[in-house]
């Protein structure tokens, strides 16, 4: 565990392929998913919103 964080991801913004929603905002997605699993969706609104804001900042319309 923790090894993936040590490997820098290739800069996807410079490629011509659009970023897929599943790959965008991994930090907020991980925190959101962990919270939902542990506490239930109704207790994780702040993390869900943070992930949505990150996605919107990358141009996703959600």
From Swiss-Prot:
UniProt subcellular location: Mitochondrion intermembrane space; Cytoplasm
Keywords: Acetylation, Chaperone, Copper, Cytoplasm, Disulfide bond, Metal-binding, Mitochondrion, Phosphoprotein
Modification(s) after translation: Acetylation by KAT8 promotes assembly of the mitochondrial respiratory chain complex IV (CIV).
N6-acetyllysine modifications at: 17, 29
Gene Ontology biological process terms from the UniProt entry: mitochondrial cytochrome c oxidase assembly
Residues with Phosphoserine modification: 13
Stretches assigned to the CHCH domain: 22-62
PROSITE patterns to which the protein is assigned, alphabetical: CHCH
GO cellular component: mitochondrial intermembrane space
Main location: mitochondrion
Keyword NADP listed: no
Ligand binding (Cu cation): 22-23
One Gene Ontology molecular-function label: copper ion binding
Renumbered ranges of motif Cx9C motif 2: 44-54
A Pfam family it matches: COX17
InterPro entries the record matches: Cys_alpha_HP_mot_SF, Cyt_c_oxidase_Cu-chaperone
Motif position, Cx9C motif 1: 25-35
Function: Copper metallochaperone essential for the assembly of the mitochondrial respiratory chain complex IV (CIV), also known as cytochrome c oxidase. Binds two copper ions and delivers them to the metallochaperone SCO1 which transports the copper ions to the Cu(A) site on the cytochrome c oxidase subunit II (MT-CO2/COX2).
Quaternary structure and partners: Interacts with COA1. Interacts with the chaperone CHCHD4; this is important for correct folding and the formation of disulfide bonds that stabilize the structure.
Name under which the protein is recorded: Cytochrome c oxidase copper chaperone
Gene that this polypeptide is encoded by: COX17
């Amino acid at each position: 565990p923790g090894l993936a964080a040590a490997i820098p991801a290739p800069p996807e913004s410079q490629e011509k392929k659009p970023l897929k929603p599943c790959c965008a905002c991994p930090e907020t997605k991980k925190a959101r998913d962990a919270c939902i699993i542990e506490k239930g969706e109704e207790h994780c609104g702040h993390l869900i919103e943070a992930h949505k804001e990150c996605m919107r900042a990358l141009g996703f319309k959600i």
